[in-house]
Amino acid sequence: MEYFTYVLFRFAHTAVGIVWIGLLYYFNFVQTEYLKEAEPDAKSDVLKKLAPNALWWFRWAAFLTFLTGLYLLYILQTGASAMIILGALMGTIMMLNVWGIIWRNQKIVIGLKQGDAVAAGAKAGLASRTNTLLSLPMLYFMVFSAHMPIGTNHYPTFINGYTDVGFLLVLVSILLIEANAIFGKMYPVIASVRAVITSSVVLTVVFSGLVYYLV
């Protein structure tokens, strides 16, 4: 029964995660780019009819991904590797961005709440771009952690109160990226679709290299 529950939650975690990240890419790569060129009537139609429905699936898929992932972490407990820990951290931050920044500001953009739609759109856009930036490193760490050769998917080793240098560098980098999502601005490295995809790929390579080799 315990094994069945684990398999069920792992499948559910993957399924709702696909919905979440798929909609994240839809918003960043398709809808946002379309709205930049759409006629006023078409833009209004998207914001009134399409966006609310898509945002409903988006935010609840994010929350369910988090909940199922939390249960899987509970099962792993001390067996969570450096990759799982960092992947889970990025996933948690991304979920908090969805509910704490993106949805709160998108309610203003789509007219469900009063406020400055331009400023709200900018805040939501920055958080959404940040999630897109973190998405590939998060997916890489979470998906491939169970398939790495023995010796590469290590556990963070604590020595005299400190852990692996690479693990710490990735941890600090993630927190700095999130700090920019909350307090910073849209930099050119994430402003366009091509830029954020490129930056996400580079970040994945850098993060994986730090975790694997700088120990």
Regions found by a protein language model. Give the residues of each.
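Polytopic transmembrane helical bundles with strong interfacial aromatic enrichment
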Residues: 1-215
